[in-house]
């Protein structure tokens, strides 16, 4: 009646650019072959899937026959981003470390599905289900400010430039 599947994926998505335009400013500089993590690099992915089924003929209430519960948990390591210092007033930034050398936080999601199959005749039936995505209502961090690594603070007010602006208000 119960099935548990678990898998782990380790991948290294390294390259010279995450999309077709990543290196367009460097086309006149010869063949540069520096590899770095691509924007969509997810080093670690862990999937757990639990499935429980009630079958006909078991000692269960009739309404549970051909019903089931499926729970899926997914955890993924954070994607890379390029960390930089707080932007200067005249524009530009200063990269800290390498391109895509910093990582966003891990994400974690649990999804659930309850279903019931109603059989009409041999080979014909209807599967009714209720699916809940993000069962725990977790707010995963998908993007961060490159100067702070925070999803909510861009770092401007804490910078010297930001403090000067506050004093001159």
What is the predicted role of each segment?
Residues 28-34, 92-100, 167-168:
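Extracytoplasmic loops and strand-loop junctions of Gram-negative outer membrane beta-barrel proteins
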Residues 21, 25, 29, 89, ...:
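Amphipathic, alpha-helical segments enriched in basic
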Residues 59-92, 105-109, 115-169:
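C-terminal beta-signal and adjacent terminal beta-strands/loops
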Residues 38-43, 100-107, 163:
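Short sequence motifs at beta-strands and strand-loop junctions characteristic
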Residues 1-80:
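Gram-negative outer-membrane beta-barrel transporters
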